[in-house]
């Protein structure tokens, strides 16, 4: 870690908070994650066929290791380039980091669910939530739509904001790009479907490992956000529920931020859900909380989320400030 990395991170968090992922920009340019997806798709098409489970698993291991190595190499090259460019390189690096963060874009997508419910009722909420979750929206009633939006916000706070920021802080651009490649691979091939059970095994397991520290850190950031927006009791509940109920989730990591958000808002989250016609039967997280979530709870979740993001930026700034004053 270096002080410059934290300074870049603070600037990147501010840029992402203010600008996000504007449609006008990415309609004209290709987002880097799209290139990651295309690279993963090439390996998937070439190697994920015509072999037994053991060979497919080995091919999947080779695939993700090659992709991670390529990402790290790209990060090293960009580091060298930005170092040579001096102040311009600093700005370009901050913009690059901001591209891989998801504060404003995530909040905007989640807010659209509340807006959809208020303007077009259940169908409006279902349409908006279908853009951010994989579950079947037709199976969701209004509280289910609200829970799905809040769960997505909490989970993606961990792997869309905290994890990329953490891996950048630990290993610079190589760490950030490797994490984003791994996370993209997990979303594309890390499923337990027959097609990817073996080929995507390594990507899924490595993604679980890479997200482990961020998921735990996100609990304290959500608790801090709850403290600033909802008081001490909400912050305490966020930590208590996360410690108690995180294991109710099928994911080893997603349960931490989702349980923290459930405690912060005093609502129930997770529970039985339908994905592709298959019901995932899990207990409710924070079962003692309110059973009926509303659009107002989505607004409250976004407020806590933004305070948590502010806490992350402030913590990074605190690490930098003493050196700037020397």
Curated annotation (Swiss-Prot):
Q: Which GO terms describe its molecular function?
A: ABC-type vitamin B12 transporter activity; threonine-phosphate decarboxylase activity
What are the disulfide bonds?
A: none
* Chief localization: membrane
Task: Provide the transmembrane region boundaries.
Answer: 58-78, 81-101, 157-177, 304-324
Q: Output a single Gene Ontology CC term carried by this record.
A: plasma membrane
Q: Which pathway does the UniProt entry assign to this protein?
A: Cofactor biosynthesis; adenosylcobalamin biosynthesis
Pfam families linked? CobD_Cbib
Keyword Transmembrane helix in record: yes
Keyword annotations for this protein? Cell membrane, Cobalamin biosynthesis, Membrane, Transmembrane, Transmembrane helix
Q: What are the BP-aspect GO terms? A: cobalamin biosynthetic process
**Topology within the bilayer:** Multi-pass membrane protein
Location in the cell reads: Cell membrane
Keyword Transport among record annotations: no
What does the UniProt record say this protein does? Converts cobyric acid to cobinamide by the addition of aminopropanol on the F carboxylic group.
Q: Which family does it belong to?
A: Belongs to the CobD/CbiB family.
This protein's name: Cobalamin biosynthesis protein CobD
């Amino acid at each position: 870690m270096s002080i410059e990395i934290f300074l870049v991170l603070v600037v990147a968090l501010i840029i992402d908070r203010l600008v996000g992922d504007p449609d006008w920009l990415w309609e004209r340019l290709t987002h880097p994650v799209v290139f990651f997806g295309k690279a993963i798709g090439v390996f998937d098409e070439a190697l994920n066929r015509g072999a037994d489970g053991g060979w497919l698993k080995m091919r999947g291991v080779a695939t993700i290791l090659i992709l991670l190595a390529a990402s790290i190499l790209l990060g090293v090259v960009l580091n060298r380039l930005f170092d040579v460019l001096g102040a311009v390189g600093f700005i370009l690096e901050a913009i690059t980091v901001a591209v891989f963060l998801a504060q404003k874009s995530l909040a905007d997508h989640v807010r659209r669910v509340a807006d959809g419910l208020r303007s077009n009722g259940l169908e409006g909420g279902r349409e908006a939530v279908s853009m951010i979750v994989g579950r079947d929206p037709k199976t969701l009633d209004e509280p289910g739509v609200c829970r799905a939006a809040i769960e997505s916000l909490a989970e993606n706070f961990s792997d869309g904001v905290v994890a990329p920021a953490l891996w950048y802080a630990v290993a610079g651009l190589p760490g950030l790009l490797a994490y984003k490649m791994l996370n993209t691979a997990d979303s594309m091939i890390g499923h337990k479907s027959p097609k990817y059970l073996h080929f995507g095994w390594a990507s899924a397991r490595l993604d679980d490992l890479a997200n482990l520290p961020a998921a735990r850190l996100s609990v304290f950031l959500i608790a801090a956000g709850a403290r600033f927006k909802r008081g001490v009791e909400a912050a305490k509940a966020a930590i208590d529920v996360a410690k108690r109920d995180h294991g109710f989730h099928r994911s080893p990591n997603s349960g931490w931020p989702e349980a923290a958000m459930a405690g912060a808002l005093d609502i129930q989250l997770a529970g039985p859900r339908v994905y592709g016609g298959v019901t995932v039967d899990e207990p409710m997280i924070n079962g003692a909380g309110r059973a009926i979530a509303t659009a107002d709870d989505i607004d409250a979740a976004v407020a806590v989320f933004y305070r948590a993001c502010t806490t992350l930026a402030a913590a990074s700034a605190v690490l930098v400030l003493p050196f700037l004053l020397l």
